[in-house]
């Protein structure tokens, strides 16, 4: 099956149009945490895609466990296993500790998972021709809020390094769904659905279009943006995007390290002066 982002977005939008009001048992006039609404909406998107793409839609940890079962059935050994190619593996591999207990303990879902949902082009799963890694974000139209954390910039730089240094053509896409909702009674109504491709967002001020992709170095080095507010103007290949992102990442990292080293030098000089005057060290 050929997967197209527009078709996936359309399936989700039509689902919410038909769904209408979603009762979440919210208490009236009470502030609710983002997760109180965001988590049920993630489940709604999962339901929408499961109906549109049956047998090809998984939560990330479900996809890993199904793939491991598939490899065992084929007589392959999952120990130290690579999920698909090395690039995809760097995004989804749960680590040696989680795999060492499999199958006695299945791979669990984690908050740090790259994707809420994984959509495959065919039943070969990670060995197939296309892997959609989909993360769901949501925001209340009635509130002003900061752009959410999207993913670790360090993780993204690592997958860029793998693809570029080993000449691996990405068979994966990083998609972000933004659900704009309004509260109503004890629930919400999703009024807007926007789906964007990470590798169509200009990582730098590319060709005079857009702004540099923002990396918050103070918040666990996270790429941050609101999916409904970014441009999709990057027109080169995925490999080109990864190269430009690496340029953005390394430039910002170099500037930050230089600043930290400069501050450290000033602090060490200050400490040395204090030590000489106080004679207590």
What are these regions (language model features)?
Residues 1-113, 119-132, 138-281:
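Nucleic-acid endonuclease domains
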